[in-house]
């Protein structure tokens, strides 16, 4: 049985594990991250620890899916007025991971971040920053449970949901929940980034 609870009930280490294992070979991270998988995993784990801290401090923060005693999925959300997190705090939290990534990956990461901020939806919305399920729990309904909670929050607030995805398979998945493509960008090494919006019910 899978239980969905607030993200603030999950440990930072577990959140970082789920996000990193889920996205290790995802197109977005292959585009911007270090080449070697082990190096990329270490960088991503540190980045996702910082992401969890940002979510707790400035985010909604989102939801955690637990199966047994194990965290198997996370959804990280922000109100539109809270995104992006304030500077220099946000960059200082990211700095150790950028240093560890090396100069070229750090530059790619900064360029990708700038692209996402430039293209970000600028009207009131709920931002779904991350939706991740650990690999062995994927295609078992965990993502659906998390996304349904996020959709309920947005509908209660009367706001649309905005997200980005660099994974082609995610585009039809999100369409199944009422999202439509509103634009498309390119990451530094050419991977496409889809921008999607779900109107509130």
Predicted ranges, named:
Residues 57-75:
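Conserved beta-hairpin
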Residues 71-132, 138, 187-188:
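Conserved acyl-donor/pantetheine-binding loop and adjacent beta-alpha core of acyl/acetyltransferases
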Residues 3-21, 25-29:
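A short beta-loop-alpha structural element at the N-terminal edge
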Residues 124-126, 154-166:
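Conserved GNAT acetyl-CoA-binding A-motif
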Residues 144, 156-157, 167-184, 188-189:
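Conserved active-site alpha-helix within GNAT-family acetyltransferase domains
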Residues 133, 139-152:
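Conserved acetyl-CoA-binding loop-helix of GNAT-fold acetyltransferases
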Residues 129-138, 162-171, 188-189, 199-200:
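Conserved beta-strand-loop-alpha-helix junction that forms the acyl-donor binding cleft
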Residues 36-61:
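Active-site rim helix/loop that mediates acceptor-substrate recognition in acyltransferases
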């Amino acid at each position: 049985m899978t239980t969905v609870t607030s993200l603030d009930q999950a440990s930072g280490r577990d959140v970082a594990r789920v996000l990193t294992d889920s996205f290790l070979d995802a197109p977005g991270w292959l585009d911007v991250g270090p080449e070697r998988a082990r190096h990329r995993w270490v960088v991503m784990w540190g980045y996702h620890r910082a992401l969890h801290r940002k979510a707790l401090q400035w985010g909604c923060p989102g939801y955690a899916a637990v199966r047994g005693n194990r965290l198997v999925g996370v959804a990280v959300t922000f109100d539109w007025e809270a995104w992006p997190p304030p500077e220099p705090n946000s960059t200082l939290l990211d700095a150790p991971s950028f240093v560890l990534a090396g100069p070229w990956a750090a530059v790619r990461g900064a360029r990708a971040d700038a692209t996402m901020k430039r293209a970000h939806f600028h009207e009131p919305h709920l931002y779904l920053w991350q939706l991740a399920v650990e690999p062995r729990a994927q295609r078992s309904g965990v993502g659906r449970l998390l996304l349904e909670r996020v959709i309920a929050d947005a509908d209660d607030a009367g706001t649309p949901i905005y997200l980005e995805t660099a994974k082609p398979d995610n585009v039809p998945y999100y369409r199944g929940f009422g999202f439509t493509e509103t634009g498309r960008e390119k990451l530094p090494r050419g991977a496409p980034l889809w921008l999607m919006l779900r109107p509130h019910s």
